[in-house]
Structure formats: C-alpha cells, structure tokens
Design a protein with these regions (language model features):
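Conserved functional loop/turn residues at catalytic and ligand-binding sites
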Residues: 89, 218, 266
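Alpha-helix C-terminal capping segments
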Residues: 74-80, 214, 301-308
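FabD-like malonyl-/acyl-CoA
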Residues: 2-139, 269-298
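A short, acidic, amphipathic alpha-helical segment used as a generic capping/interface helix at domain edges
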Residues: 252-267
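Alpha/beta catalytic cores of group-transfer enzymes, especially the acyltransferase/condensing modules
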Residues: 11-13, 39-40, 100-251
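Short, flexible loop segments at boundaries between secondary-structure elements
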Residues: 231, 291-309
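Non-catalytic positions within long, well-ordered alpha-helices that form the structural scaffold/packing
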Residues: 78, 182, 263-266
Length: 309
C-alpha cells in the first residue's frame, strides 16, 4: 500500500474570506481559529475574513493567517493517516504543528515574529522576487551569476517545478531580469507581489534575531518525518529541525527534490491542506502519476469526512 504525504502551502495562497466558511460551522476548526485570535495582538480573524484594513498582504499578518487556516482544516479531518509532512516555505510551520514539533500557539507566535523580522529587514523597494518560467535550474543559476555584482545579488530561491524557478535578490536586478527575461531564454519572468528578497542570502541579516526568538519555545521530536525545504529529506530530530528552520530564511526551497524524495520513499498520495491548489499544480508537473487531494474549504472537509467515517 502506498504512503501519504500531507503538504501545506506558503505565502501567495492567502485570500480575503479565508477560513470564514469554517468558522462556527466546524467545531474543531472554530477552536483553532479562536485560539489563534487569542494568541496574537491584532484582529487576525477580521483580517482573514474581511481584510477591511487591507493588511492581509503584509507578511507579518499573512504568515499567521495561512498557518491558522491550514491547521483549522487539518484539525477538522477524520481518520487522516499521515506518513510524511512537507510545507512550502511558510507552510513548513504547518508541518511542524501537524507532526507535533511545535504547539500551535507557539507556531503562531513564531511566524508572526518571522513576518515582522522579514518586513523590517529591508525598506520597501530594496529587494524582490520573480518567477522565471520555461528555464531549468542550471540556466537560471547561470543567469543569476551573470547579473550579480559585488554590491548586488540575485539567486534562485524556490526550485518549484521543472520550468518554474523563483529568484530573489536586489530589486534592480529583479527588474533587469523581468525586462530581459525573454532574450535570456525564459518564456516569461513575472515579478512577485512580495516585500522582500525572501530565501536569498540577503536574509542572513535576521538570522541571529530569529534564532534567539525561536529558542524560547519547546521543540519536540517529530511524530513522523518532515521533509525540510533546505535539505529535501525527512527529519525527526527536534534540534536538526530547528536549525533548518533558521537556515530556511536565507536558503532556497528545494521543492522538486523534496517531492522526488517523498515519491522515492513510496508516497503515491499527496494531500494539500490550505487555501489554493498551488502545490498540487507543482507536484503534478514533477510527477503526473501520483494522486493529489486538495482540502481548502468546508465542503472539502465534509467530503473527506463523509468518506472516512
């Protein structure tokens, strides 16, 4: 019998109204949502459900919102068998909660701080990210090396799927790549709506502050392996996982390698839990033979639970 990996999306999947269908409709989800609200110092649920103040897109708000939505969905599922977990960037924190490494409230506090540090690291306009479509990793890496100078850098940041590599770095170089992308061989280069050079070595400036912050929380060995973004293999040791979560700030997300590692362990069913189907699409591009289930709404939860009574 094949194995199951539960996967969690990262930033970019947020949308106004997220998790509002679960609230007061699904008891276990409602408990998670209320707990998150009690843990942070701003009106998280108002931001998720209506975004009246337009702040959902700010990374210090986006991160706790996405973590909360994924865990609210996860907690509502009956008889979910898990062999491995994996998350994309921020989604890795949902994996930590799912596998018992972090208490949910601690994870909420950590991703809130992670977002604040990321937002404070560089003024708006200094760094950015872009998705390069139609080139493989080696091609993108060569282009980045050519564009980078002693003063400014651009690096591969998310190795998402064959033909989709996200780069990160100084904004002028991102803009140059967007402008020259086609002549460099890319089908398209799309700037991403992010406020900083995430997953690039520029983010090392917050390494020490973040490491000190997460040390105050209890980290437990994982109940089942978490395939980590930085090394694309399953880890269960709490200290190793914690170290890798710091490295994750300034290291590329090895999503292709992580997915292939899981398939090599016998995983043939991926369950994406959280808003959107971004990871489902990437996994299909990596291997079209695996089964993929998406759980992103109350209806999805009801459908799953009706089939797993």
């Amino acid at each position: 019998m094949g194995k199951i990996a539960v996967v969690f999306p990262g930033q970019g999947a947020q949308k106004v109204g997220m998790a509002s269908d679960l609230y007061n409709e699904e008891e276990r989800s409602t408990r998670v949502l209320n707990l998150a609200q009690e843990t942070v110092e701003f009106d998280l649920l108002e931001t998720m459900f209506t975004d009246n103040d337009g702040k959902l897109g700010e990374t210090e708000n986006t991160q706790p919102a996405l973590l909360t939505h994924s865990i609210a969905l996860l907690e509502s599922l009956n008889h979910l068998k898990v062999d491995y977990t994996m998350g994309h960037s921020l989604g890795e924190y949902s994996s930590l909660v799912a596998s018992g490494v972090l208490a949910f409230e601690d994870a909420v506090r950590i991703v809130r701080k992670r977002g604040q540090l990321m937002a404070q690291a560089f003024p708006n306009g200094v760094g950015g990210m872009a998705a390069v479509l139609g080139l493989n990793y080696d091609d993108v890496d060569k282009i980045c090396q050519t564009l980078s100078t002693n003063e400014q850098l651009i690096e591969p940041a998310n190795i998402n799927s064959p033909g989709q590599i996200v780069v990160s770095g100084h904004k002028p170089l991102i803009d140059e790549l967007v402008e020259k992308g086609k002549e460099l061989g890319a089908k398209r280069v799309l700037p991403l709506a992010v406020s900083g050079p995430f997953h690039s070595s520029m983010m090392k400036v917050i390494e020490e502050d973040f490491a000190n912050f997460i040390n105050q929380f209890e980290w437990h060995n994982a109940n089942y392996p978490i395939v980590q973004n930085v090394n694309a293999k399953g880890e269960t040791d709490a200290e190793v996982i914690k170290r890798n979560m710091v490295k994750q700030l300034y290291s590329p997300v090895q999503f292709i390698q992580s997915t292939e590692w899981l398939i090599n362990q016998g995983v043939d069913h991926f369950i994406e839990i959280g808003p959107g189907k971004v990871l489902s699409g990437l996994i299909k591009k990596i291997n079209r033979d695996v089964k993929i289930t998406s759980i992103q709404t109350l209806e999805d939860v009801k459908g799953w639970n009706n089939n797993h009574e």
